[in-house]
Amino acid sequence: MRLRMLILVALACALVAASDGQAQVQDTPFQVRYFANLQNGESLINITNTGANGAPLLGPGFGSDKNAGNICVNVYAFSPDEQLVSCCSCLVTPNAVVNLGVNRDLTSKTLTGVIPNSVVVKLLATRKSTGDTTSCSNSAADPTLVPVYGLVAWGTTLHAAVGGGFAITETQFAPATLSEGEKASIQGRCAAILGNGSGYGICASCRLGALGAEASRR
């Protein structure tokens, strides 16, 4: 009986350790977050590259490996009715941090011209299958690029506060499962925007640096 109890305890500990290990993996290739109440103020996205694919030995300014570990973070913004309203790509180097404004960069020039009050933003980290990634031009529509780990992102959004007004919250993007069907859909629809949108639906690329929460418009 004692041996049986010890085995059960050991098994339970192993399962807890395994689940904790899985929970700690946050830099998955595909991540999702929603942004709400956009007419009341800006929502912000901060993105970094954890270095999961390597990093320059002597830093980004010197050496033959100065482009090691770079990833493309491909951005897809969806309106509440499932329409892809904008897409774009950002080159993110290891240990760098870049930002996007949802109003400023993702919804200011949508494909349809309609500016939604809330969006779902999906991020997909990719890189070339061989060699270093030095450009992310049109990578959001490129099915040949390989999804990779190394992406971590946070976002702020506005929630109605008790007593009126809005409160700003910041949370990490949620790691998500990327099916082949979803990958083909978002990349194919982005390709249609790039090819036929006459510049509309192409969101502005990331800017260097992290941004804190901004005040809402009451």
Where are the regions that the model predicts?
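Gly/Pro-rich, tryptophan- and cysteine-flecked surface segments typical
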Residues: 19-218
